[in-house]
Structures are given as structure tokens and as C-alpha cells.
């Protein structure tokens, strides 16, 4: 392995694993994703040997062990760095009371967003298993955030903890929405006329309402424009219900991992 070899970036979220092989300048050589469910392994068979692997893992020890085994099977003894949030990195300052308690995915995502929209105040909304919000000032100061149940989790919880409501999965709920909320938003409030649509639309609008409320509150507090950046597995559904301007970015965590890798390489003198 040479200093010019690419980095392998791995984002292990609660529902799936995303990865990318990138060069030192951030150019992507290859990328992929796979769910935690099932026995599938990442297809790294045709990839060149990376200099190091970088992992953000919020999915637990079993997933970490699975990733380590996959790496060792393809590239024995490849160095693996599992990132943790810290007080300051890549121009972002962490205001959490205990900086290391912040999820590594949120930390890497903020680093990626700060670099992608340099000089802008941001509200970052990620719609995954959990919905997370981060308020990030233009100077890189993360002032705090929120965590709520994600879109799919909201629907599943209602089905599992009530006697008569159906348990909707994401696939079924997407079919029920079918652009109806966005269309209704142009003509008036949306009220469904059957239980499954009431549930799917209600959870979608709950997500959108949270984001819109915090975006408006943040602009009122800071008295400056704030860019709303959205991402995550349920971004299509929730973004369709938003009535405020927003920008989509699908690779914030991987982008942040690339920046962390580059900063560490400079520190090592590579």
C-alpha cells in the first residue's frame, strides 16, 4: 500500500451500510450500499487496495464485527479507523456537553455539510431510522440538535402499539402517498379518507412539521438566512411534504469521512 492509494469509507447506519472508495482529492472510484438484513456482503472483489478504511458505525458491535470480517477477508491487516465525535475537527466545533456522546454519523454529516455549503448557516435534517436535526452556524459551530422517531419507525410503532391500526412498512406507505400530500399542499390541507393513508400521511406531515418549525425558529433566533439540507432514506417522502426551501445531499456522512481521512493524512505527514 502506498500513500497515493485511495481510502475506503464506510457508513454503517441503523438500516444499511453505505461505502465509497475515494482518492486523496475526493474523487469517487466506486460506491455501493446493502441492508443489514440478509447475508449479503459488500462487493469489494474488483477494487484496488486502499491505504486505510474509515468507519462511522452507529449500528452496534455485531455490524462492526461483520464489517471487520469482510475487510479482513478481502485485504488482510488493512488498517481500520472507527471515527468518534470529538470537540473539534475539520472546521466544525462540537457544543455537546459530552462531545464524544454525539453519534459519529451526525458528526461526519455535519463536517460534510459544513464543507459543502461553506460560509452558510445550516439546519441539517436526516430522515433515517431516526430523524435528526443539527443547527450548524457558518463558522462551524454546532449549537445543538434534536432526535425524533424516523418516518418508518413512527408508522411501525403505531401499528405495533395499537389494537386496530395497521402496521405499514415503508414500501406500502410510499404507494399510499403517491404525491398526494405535495398536490394537496398547493390546493389546501390534506385529510385522508381511509386509515392506511391517514397513518402514512400523518407521519409524513409530522416529520415535515418538525423540520419547518425548527427552520423558522432558527432563522428567527439567528436573524440570518439558514439553508435547510435534507438527506436520508426517507428524504423523498418527507421532502415532498415540505413547504420551505431545501437542498438535498445524499452523501453527507461519506463526504465527512473523506474530509476526516484527509485531515488525518496531513497530520501523519502523508
Curated annotation (Swiss-Prot):
Q: Would you kindly state one Gene Ontology biological process term found in this protein's UniProt entry?
A: coenzyme A biosynthetic process
Coding gene?
Answer: coaX
| Cofactor comment text | A monovalent cation. Ammonium or potassium.
Q: What is this protein called?
A: Type III pantothenate kinase
Q: Name one Pfam family in it.
A: Pan_kinase
Q: Which domain of life is it from?
A: Bacteria
**Reaction catalyzed:** (R)-pantothenate + ATP = (R)-4'-phosphopantothenate + ADP + H(+)
Binding-site positions, substrate = 96, 103-106, 195
Subcellular localization is given as: Cytoplasm
Q: Which residues form the active site?
A: 105 (proton acceptor)
- Disulphide bridges, residue numbers: none
Organism, by scientific name, is Paraburkholderia phytofirmans (strain DSM 17436 / LMG 22146 / PsJN)
Q: Does the keyword Protein biosynthesis apply?
A: no
Family (UniProt): Belongs to the type III pantothenate kinase family.
Q: Where does ATP bind?
A: 11-18, 129
Give yes or no: UniProt keyword ATP-binding. yes
| Reported cofactor(s) | NH4(+); K(+)
The alphabetical list of record keywords is:
ATP-binding, Coenzyme A biosynthesis, Cytoplasm, Kinase, Nucleotide-binding, Potassium, Transferase
Q: Which GO terms describe its cellular component?
A: cytoplasm
Looking up HAMAP family in the UniProt record yields: Pantothen_kinase_3
**Summary of the function given for this chain in its UniProt record:** Catalyzes the phosphorylation of pantothenate (Pan), the first step in CoA biosynthesis.
Assembly and partners?
Homodimer.
Enzyme superclass (EC) = transferase
A molecular function GO annotation: ATP binding
Amino acid at each position: 500500500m502506498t500513500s497515493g492509494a485511495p481510502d475506503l469509507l464506510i457508513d454503517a447506519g441503523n438500516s444499511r451500510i453505505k461505502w465509497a472508495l475515494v482518492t486523496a482529492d475526493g474523487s469517487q472510484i466506486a460506491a455501493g450500499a446493502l441492508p443489514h438484513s440478509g447475508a449479503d456482503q459488500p462487493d469489494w472483489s474488483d477494487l484496488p487496495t486502499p491505504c486505510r478504511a474509515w468507519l462511522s458505525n452507529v449500528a452496534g458491535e455485531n455490524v462492526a464485527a461483520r464489517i471487520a470480517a469482510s475487510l479482513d477477508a478481502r485485504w488482510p491487516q488493512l488498517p481500520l479507523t472507527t471515527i468518534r465525535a470529538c470537540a473539534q475537527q475539520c472546521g466544525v466545533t462540537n457544543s455537546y456537553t459530552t462531545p464524544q456522546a454525539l453519534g459519529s454519523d451526525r458528526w461526519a454529516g455535519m463536517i460534510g455539510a459544513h464543507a459543502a455549503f461553506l460560509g452558510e448557516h445550516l439546519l441539517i435534517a436526516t430522515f433515517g431510522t431516526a430523524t435528526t436535526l443539527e443547527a450548524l452556524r457558518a463558522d462551524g459551530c454546532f449549537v445543538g440538535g434534536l432526535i425524533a422517531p424516523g418516518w418508518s419507525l413512527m408508522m411501525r410503532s403505531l401499528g405495533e402499539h395499537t389494537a386496530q391500526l395497521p402496521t405499514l412498512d415503508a414500501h406500502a406507505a410510499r404507494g399510499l402517498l403517491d404525491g398526494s400530500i405535495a398536490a394537496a399542499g398547493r390546493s389546501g390541507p390534506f385529510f385522508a379518507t381511509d386509515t392506511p393513508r391517514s397513518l402514512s400521511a400523518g407521519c409524513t406531515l409530522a416529520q415535515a412539521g418538525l423540520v419547518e418549525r425548527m427552520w423558522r425558529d432558527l432563522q428567527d433566533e439567528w436573524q440570518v438566512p439558514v439553508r435547510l439540507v435534507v438527506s436520508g432514506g426517507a428524504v423523498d417522502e418527507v421532502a415532498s411534504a415540505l413547504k420551505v426551501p431545501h437542498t438535498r445531499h445524499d452523501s453527507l456522512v461519506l463526504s465527512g469521512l473523506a474530509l476526516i481521512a484527509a485531515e488525518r493524512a496531513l497530520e501523519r505527514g502523508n
